[in-house]
């Protein structure tokens, strides 16, 4: 608990409650319109219409629906309660503390979920209006093309996806990254893989991060050095800035590695007790002034199909990297 920030959760039910409002100028609700999109899709497929054409029409409808969701009115009672919880949990009102809005959906509870990052997360938002607008944008994010396409591969009822939002105060960490509690490169179940970069959002955003394997005997091996010469910081005024750093020193010290290794072992022990089974975990964390801050723990699921999906690859831009 000492390594986790306090937070406010906007649960699935708040999203559904807002979805039951009528759409502007219509007699039907947002929820009814969403259901009609997928029922029309099923009917067109049953009628023998080319699946590619059906998908194109569905994506057009979802694009319109997403634009409507981004403008959905927030209920006065909800905003009032949110104000109260900000004051109670954070000690400040909305607009006076920068926060992260982290998305979550009920499909992420599925054991085979491998779609981390499909939905929107907003970081270091300070302005009150941007926080409230951000809630709408996070609610709308499961209806992007990428998120829809992922759900179609795994869910029979892709329309029944409910987003929740975790609001946590921003921590301007010195370095951040991920831990996988198994040896990713060699597949050894007893090893721990660590990838870190300077600043916030390290390793999670696909950076060329500094990566290690921590072996069961306590020794470590550098798999790849960090190659990022700039890193993101999040000032108290909101938003983000970039700073530049030399590569003459490692991102993680020996003490960092030992502390991260110990933290990972404690998390595995605790999570295995909670779940009642032994698993590998994907852990997001950061380090600020030598203290580890834990941001997220989820089961680590390897998805070989996703790694070879031409569709998913086609949605990712190609970047050219030049190293000097």
Indicate where each model-derived feature is located.
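Two-metal-ion RNase H-like nuclease active-site motif
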Residues: 165-168, 281
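Conserved divalent-metal-coordinating catalytic cores
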Residues: 1-2, 6, 10-19, 28-32, ...
């Amino acid at each position: 608990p000492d390594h986790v920030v306090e937070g406010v959760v906007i649960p699935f039910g708040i999203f559904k409650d807002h979805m039951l409002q009528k759409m502007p100028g219509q007699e039907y609700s947002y929820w009814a319109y969403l259901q009609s999109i997928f029922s029309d899709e099923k009917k067109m497929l049953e009628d023998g219409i080319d699946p590619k054409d059906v998908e194109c029409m569905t994506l057009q409808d979802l694009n319109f629906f997403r634009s409507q969701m981004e403008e959905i009115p927030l209920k006065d009672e909800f905003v009032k309660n949110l104000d109260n919880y900000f004051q109670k949990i954070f000690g400040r009102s909305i607009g006076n503390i920068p926060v992260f809005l982290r998305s979550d959906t009920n499909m992420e509870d599925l054991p085979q979920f491998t779609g981390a990052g499909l939905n929107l997360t907003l970081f270091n938002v300070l302005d009150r209006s941007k926080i409230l607008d951000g809630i709408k944008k996070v609610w709308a994010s499961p209806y992007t093309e990428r998120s829809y396409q992922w759900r179609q591969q795994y869910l029979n009822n892709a329309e029944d996806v409910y987003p929740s939002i975790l609001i946590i105060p921003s921590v301007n960490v010195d370095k951040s990254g991920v831990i996988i509690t198994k040896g990713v490169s060699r597949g050894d179940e007893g090893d721990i893989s660590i990838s870190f970069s300077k600043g916030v959002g390290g390793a999670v955003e696909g950076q060329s991060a500094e990566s290690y394997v921590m072996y069961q005997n306590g020794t470590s091996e550098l798999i790849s050095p960090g190659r990022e010469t700039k890193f993101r910081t999040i000032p108290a005024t909101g938003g983000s800035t970039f700073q530049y750093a030399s590569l003459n020193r490692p991102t993680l010290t020996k003490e960092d590695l030992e502390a991260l290794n110990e933290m990972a072992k404690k998390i595995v022990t605790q999570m295995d007790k909670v779940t009642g089974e032994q698993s590998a975990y994907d852990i997001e964390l950061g380090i600020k002034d030598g203290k580890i801050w834990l941001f997220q723990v989820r089961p680590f699921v390897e998805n070989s199909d996703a790694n070879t999906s031409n569709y998913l690859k086609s949605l990712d831009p190609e970047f050219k990297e030049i190293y000097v």
